[in-house]
Amino acid sequence: MHLHLNHKDLLPEKRRLIENLRLREDVLANKTILVVDDDVRNLFALTTAFERHNIKAITAESGQEAINILGENLNVDMVLMDIMMPEMDGYETTQKIRREHKNSNLPIIAVTAKAMKGDREKCIEAGASDYITKPVKIDQLLSLMRVWLYK
């Protein structure tokens, strides 16, 4: 994981929004994030980083487990969805969440190693709110999360 953020990669309006957010109380504090990934190393890395920012993480190692958690827990503020998972991949899981979950505005960020042309669009078409590639840069992920949780 890389721990730096390149502001040049952001659109000017998102850059201004993030700079304003950093001046205020952190919108990530006390938020509940569902992290869906079949690789426990990724789950560990993200949950460890989230602890430092007072973010509560709930983990799921499969798409079906994520759907079950969302069915039981209406207090999830955001989902980070790995795309490449066995059985039910992130595309199918995202589509099911969009069809079945009570909060249709729930931000879902696709987290994937797929960085080829068209991969971002495929994630958005499946129902993801946004997209970030692996290896995840924690500061960049946190900034993206702030943008979606601030809305």
PLM regions and their residue ranges:
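C-terminal catalytic ATP-binding subdomain
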Residues: 1-24, 47-55, 64-67, 72-73, ...
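Conserved acidic segment of CheY-like receiver
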Residues: 30-40, 46-50, 79
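Helix N-cap/capping motif at the beta->alpha junctions
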Residues: 38, 59-68, 90
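Active-site beta3 strand of CheY-like receiver
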Residues: 74-81
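Receiver (REC) domain active-site loop signature in two-component systems and cognate sites
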Residues: 85
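A Lys-centered signature of the CheY-like receiver
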Residues: 134
